[in-house]
């Protein structure tokens, strides 16, 4: 793959926000909290979006939700993903985020394929209903004022019920600053290959910037996607789990430089793991054991693709304190580098395809006026 010519990848503007390197950290519930975002921020400039929170929980003053919505001291761009199914709650939540947290950007999630969300008409099921999607997005944009709003969605329910072109048009007409397409259907979940040709279609269909999401496992994939699709930028989800340094290589590749951390040393991984836990302990007002147990899923991602052996993996998944993690990482062979076959190892969600659970008759009339029950607003990561 020919390197990018310096300056060939144009900056992207979202309102007053200028992204010189058009890379976005995908918001992931339970993952992209401030400790993880701050780690990523130390490796490269990008738009680091806070984890998904629900509008209803904010409006109803759920203390944990407000804790998860917090930003770090000096965080350069206060960006957050909001999920809501009721336009009134969405508008109230956006105003509260502006007033209390002085947010700079709101992203909205319409891509979650989890059955307990879609069977109630939420998540990836919402774009089927054009009026519902439009009313939710319009309420967010109106409440946000000068704060840019973006939305993320999938191709559709399945290959027979594609909604992404309509969703892009609705977002543009509502005043969104950009959209992100996860180039899979809800039925696909996270299986198979992302359909980058769908991103191309969306780019050609609307005038606002399109970010592509799906199958960026190494930095060169980002350049391939942009060249293949004409997308304005890329959004990174599973590809950065367990490797926050991924953003350093993305910035390098998109600015015409060679990446140097595609195959890091296990010593670097150990150091970053310990740094990550220290940041978690500083951020969360919980006992050390609870915080370290929260980290265990990250630990599995950090060593994905590494030949560390079953015993070290077992010990990692049982750690209950920073001292225990320090002892386990002390047994790492710090000098080995990630094997070539480990670069593209998939992390987190890998399931699918699976029939999408939907309310009865949901696909019959895309223009139907509909109001969703509160049960459609469940805080489940996905997009």
Tell me the role of every PLM-derived stretch.
Residues 55-57, 113-114, 187-188, 219, ...:
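Short secondary-structure capping/turn micro-motifs that flank functional sites
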């Amino acid at each position: 793959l020919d390197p990018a010519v310096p300056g060939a990848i144009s900056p992207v503007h979202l309102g007053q926000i200028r992204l010189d390197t058009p890379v976005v950290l995908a918001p992931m519930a339970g993952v992209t909290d401030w400790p993880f975002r701050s780690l990523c921020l130390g490796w490269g400039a990008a738009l680091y979006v806070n984890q998904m929170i629900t509008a209803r929980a904010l409006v109803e003053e759920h203390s944990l939700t407000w804790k998860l919505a917090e930003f770090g001291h000096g965080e350069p761009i206060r960006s957050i993903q909001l999920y809501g199914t009721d336009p009134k709650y969405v508008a109230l939540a956006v105003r509260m985020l502006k007033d209390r947290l002085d947010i700079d950007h709101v992203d909205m999630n319409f891509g979650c394929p989890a059955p307990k969300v879609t069977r109630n008409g939420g998540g990836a099921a919402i774009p089927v209903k054009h009026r519902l999607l439009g009313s939710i997005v319009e309420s967010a944009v109106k409440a946000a004022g000068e704060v840019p709003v973006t939305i993320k969605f999938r191709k559709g329910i399945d290959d027979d019920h594609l909604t992404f072109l309509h969703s892009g048009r609705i977002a543009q007409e509502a005043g969104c600053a950009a959209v992100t397409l996860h180039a899979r259907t809800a039925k696909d979940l996270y299986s198979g290959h992302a359909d980058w040709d769908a991103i191309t279609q969306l780019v050609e269909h609307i005038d606002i910037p399109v970010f592509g999401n799906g199958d960026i496992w190494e930095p060169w994939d980002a350049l391939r996607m942009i060249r293949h699709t004409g997308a304005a930028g890329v959004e990174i989800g599973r590809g950065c789990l367990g490797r926050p340094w991924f953003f350093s290589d993305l910035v390098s590749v998109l600015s015409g430089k060679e990446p140097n951390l595609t195959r890091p040393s296990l010593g670097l991984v150990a150091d970053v793991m310990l740094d990550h836990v220290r940041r978690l302990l500083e951020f969360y007002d919980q006992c050390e054991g609870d915080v370290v147990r929260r980290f265990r899923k990250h630990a599995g991602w950090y060593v994905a693709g590494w030949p560390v052996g079953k015993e070290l993996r077992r010990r990692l998944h049982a750690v209950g304190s920073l001292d225990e993690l320090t002892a386990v990482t002390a047994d790492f062979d710090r000098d080995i580098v990630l094997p070539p076959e480990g670069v593209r190892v998939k992390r987190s969600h890998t399931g699918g395809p699976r029939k999408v659970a939907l309310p009865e008759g949901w696909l019959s009339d895309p223009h139907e006026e509909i109001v969703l029950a509160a049960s459609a607003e469940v805080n489940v990561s996905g997009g």
